[in-house]
Amino acid sequence: MSVIGWLQISLLFLAVLVVVKPLGLYMAGVLSGEPNVLSPILGPVERGLYGAAGIDPTREQGWLAYTLSMLAFSIAGFLLLFAILRLQAWMPLNPQGFGNVPPDLAFNTAVSFVTNTNWQNYGGETTLSHFSQMMGLTVQNFVSAATGISIALAVTRSFARSAAPTIGNFWVDLTRSTLYVLLPLAVLVAVAFVAMGLPQTFRASVEATTLEGVKQTIALGPVASQEAIKQLGTNGGGFFNVNAAHPFENPTALSNYLNIFAMLSVSAALLYTFGQLVGNRRQGWAFIAVTYAFLIVGVGIVYWAEAQGNPILSQLGLDPALGNMEGKEVRFGQAMTALYATVTTGLSDGGVNGMHGSFTGLGGLVPMFLIQLGEVLPGGIGSGLYGMIVFAILAVFVAGLMVGRTPELLGKKIEAREMKYAMLAVLILPLSILGFTAISAVMPSAVASVGTAGPHGLSEILYAYTSAGGNNGSAFGGLSGNTLWYNTTLGFAMLLGRFAYAVPVLAIAGSIAAKTRASTSKGTFPTDTPLFAGLLIGIILILGGLQFLPALALGPIVEHFAMLSGQTF
């Protein structure tokens, strides 16, 4: 570790804090329908879309209608993307001449991008045409992120309103999130990426001659535009197989900084947006403080673990001064790789600039554990906010038990109905992750896809289902996931992680919205204080992480101690 490394990390976190308030206020305004600087340009587009789709923007929906609209839109998106992938050979913009994507891989990929997971069992530059990348994947990068924002906005309204039968209009929320938040930000970031050297072209490839005189074909494509929304929407799916470690997807230290900044800023600002819309900005800052506490500790552990290096390699005579550089890009180094890995898993981004499977046991444990906590730190775009609210509901319930009062969150009483839905949502992740991992660990055909022996082999399976269930998309690279079993089961894990979580959350929103908002009294437990933030951290650790401890003990924890003892597999 070095002072420069810590300065790089600190500056990034400070830069995000600087934009949290202005970006949060902007989103609070545009998502509420207030006029803004883009209204003269995008207002007619918004109204035109409503007219073409036959949507009345003034007609709001109850939680069930909102949920059904969200599910219908997601199903339509899945079917469209699946069709594009299966018919790729006959689609335009296919200069590479790629064939149709096999059905099981097309299912996995379509589910992956519709659920904002972006798990990739393929190499983008060797499998997908420009049409599939742009009209299929990039479109879903926008609308899946907008879907997450919409759900979070519905939950936010439920706390802001009093005795309300509705929580908003899904189609309006989806449209505004796309037009006024994601699209303009993506244009700005894409232009910046082009200036930093990312390709933006319809050419398939360019042929170059290496220093050794060997001809090499270098893949090209519309990379910058996809990279921008990949990060802003916490999607994470790369244009190239090695994601942000590829020099055309992340060429410099500056582009790496912008990648991390883009993926973290919108999700963090949404927490402030929540505070603004419910009339308690301190609540938004309390949530941000919780996320920063986890991220700072997480990046510190990863940075330290990777900087220590691998003692087994040191015993073989390799210089340990640079730490564990296996799977890392020299142009980024230990600090920026550790920061990227921590942020991408604290969010639901899943993009990588280094190979997580090449981290040390302790270094690989942290990214996996952050996903298992529910990716609420600050989590995916939108999904992180409503996931944080679920844990906040559980935290005030525990606080209410301790002081003998009916728990309240922002003036709304938390009763049995909300607790049942909250616990149902929290149990989805371990059920999906541990269930599929256990089955795969004893199936010979599934174990055959594992590329590493010993505890790291179990970690590869556990990380895969953790990533899928947590809608993250990153992976330990030793697992060959492009098989019928993994394509299918990972797809179902992604569906559970997205929709089996979102439906109970929207049910909570409907129940909360119908309650009368009470004024604060002397007996009310404040939820915008350091005390509550500490309680929330404890609840996230206990309910979000403790259930995975036995599995982690058999995987990365054992691997760490095996490395220290010099044992190999």
From Swiss-Prot:
Annotated localization: Cell inner membrane
Membrane topology (UniProt): Multi-pass membrane protein
Membrane-spanning ranges: 11-31, 64-84, 135-155, 179-199, 258-278, 285-305, 384-404, 423-443, 490-510, 531-551
Gene Ontology MF annotations: P-type potassium transmembrane transporter activity; potassium ion binding
Database matches in Pfam families: KdpA
A cellular component annotation (GO) from this entry: plasma membrane
Keywords from the UniProt entry: Cell inner membrane, Cell membrane, Ion transport, Membrane, Plasmid, Potassium, Potassium transport, Transmembrane, Transmembrane helix, Transport
InterPro entries registered for this protein in UniProt: KdpA (IPR004623)
Complex and partners: The system is composed of three essential subunits: KdpA, KdpB and KdpC.
Job description of the protein: Part of the high-affinity ATP-driven potassium transport (or Kdp) system, which catalyzes the hydrolysis of ATP coupled with the electrogenic transport of potassium into the cytoplasm. This subunit binds the periplasmic potassium ions and delivers the ions to the membrane domain of KdpB through an intramembrane tunnel.
Family of this protein: Belongs to the KdpA family.
Name under which the protein is recorded: Potassium-transporting ATPase potassium-binding subunit
Organism ancestry: Bacteria, Pseudomonadati, Pseudomonadota, Alphaproteobacteria, Hyphomicrobiales
Gene designation: kdpA
